[in-house]
C-alpha cells in the first residue's frame, strides 16, 4: 500500500497521541494550525510530520491543502467542522472528527455519499468509547430477546483524588470557559417513561451522589439532551435514559453559589474592563454595600442558598481561597464569567507531577427474555501520566488514540461506509474495540452487578 498522508487541523492537548499513533504506523501527517509556532511545537521531533500554518476560513488555502492528502482530521472547535467537510467533499477526501454530529454536519450526508467519502465522527472518549460499549451491550441484550429498561451513562475528566486539592476538586487542562458554560446548559432526559427537563440555572441543584466504586466520592448531573438516544441507540423500550457528567462531591454546591451570586454571567460590565481590586469587582457583582469582606460575605450568604451552616463555611472559605475578597487586581475581561475564568485558570492548573483521571461508566438495567432482571455495568477508569513526565494525560490518550485508530481504519478500508457517520453499529464498532483493547489497553470492563 502506498504511503498515506493525513492533514491534521489543530494542536490542542489531545492531538499528540493522535499524531504519535499515526506517524508510528508510517502515515505522513501535516500538522496545520493558524500559527506556525503551535504546529512546530506539536510536531517537533516527530518523524513523518510537517508543520504548516493554515487558516480554515480561507477556502482556497484549505482546499489546496486538503487536495494534497488522503484524509483530513478536524480537531479544531466543532463550529468549523462543516467548513472542513465541505472542502473535503469538493476534493473527495475522507474526514475524521471526535465531535458530535451537528445538524450542519448532518446536512452534508448526501453530498458526502455522492463524493464517495467517509466522514467519521464521535470517535474520542465521550462521544466515542462510550458509544462502542453502549452499543455492544444493547445489541447483545436485544439478540438474546431482552430489553434495556434503564440506560445511565456518566463520564468525568477529573484530577486524580490526591490532586483534587482545591475547593472545587477540579483542575483545568484546557479553557475553563467551556467547562463553566456547560454548567449553565439546560438538560433533558427520560425518567419513568417521561421526558424530564431541567433549566440551566437549576442544573447544579439536581446533582446527586453517584456510586461507582466505594473509593470515589462522585456526584452526577445530566448533560444537555439525552432524549435522542432512544432512537440513536435503538432502545425504544427504555423508561430511563440519562447521559451525564461526574464530578467530586462539593463541586455542584460551589458552582451553584457562583451562579446564585452572578459570577457565571457573561453580560458586559464596564467596571470589569479595568484592573480593579477583586474585592471592588465582587462588591459590584454581588451588589454589596461596601467592599469589606464582612459586607461582601453577608450579601453572598443572603443571596445564595446553602444546605447547612457547615457547607456555607466551606464555600465561603473556598471563595476566599479564590481571592475574590482580596486586594489582588482582576484580569479584566469585560464580564464576570471571563474575569473569573482568568483567576480559575491561574489557581487551578495541573502542577508538575500531578495526574488526571477519567472515569466512564454505563449502567444497564435489563429485563431478560424470561422476565428476570439484571443490572450490568461497563466501566473505564484510567489515570494519566504525571504532568512533566512526557506521557499522555488520561483525557488526551482516550480522545486521541481512538481518533487515530479510526483514521487508520478509514484509510485501509476497514471502515468503508460512506456519508456522515458515528460509531452506532457493530460493523463499525467491533474492529475499533478490538484494536483499542489489544493494541492500546483501552477497554470498558463489563460486570453483572445485580
Swiss-Prot record:
An MF annotation (GO) of this entry: saccharopine dehydrogenase (NADP+, L-glutamate-forming) activity
InterPro entries: AASS, NAD(P)-bd_dom_sf, Sacchrp_dh-like_C, Sacchrp_dh_NADP-bd
Pfam families recorded: Sacchrp_dh_C, Sacchrp_dh_NADP
The EC number(s) this enzyme carries: 1.5.1.10
Highest taxon of source: Eukaryota
Catalytic activity: L-saccharopine + NADP(+) + H2O = (S)-2-amino-6-oxohexanoate + L-glutamate + NADPH + H(+)
Transmembrane spans: none
Sorted UniProt keywords: Amino-acid biosynthesis, Lysine biosynthesis, NADP, Oxidoreductase
Protein name: Saccharopine dehydrogenase [NADP(+), L-glutamate-forming]
Taxonomic source organism: Pyricularia oryzae (strain 70-15 / ATCC MYA-4617 / FGSC 8958)
Gene: LYS3
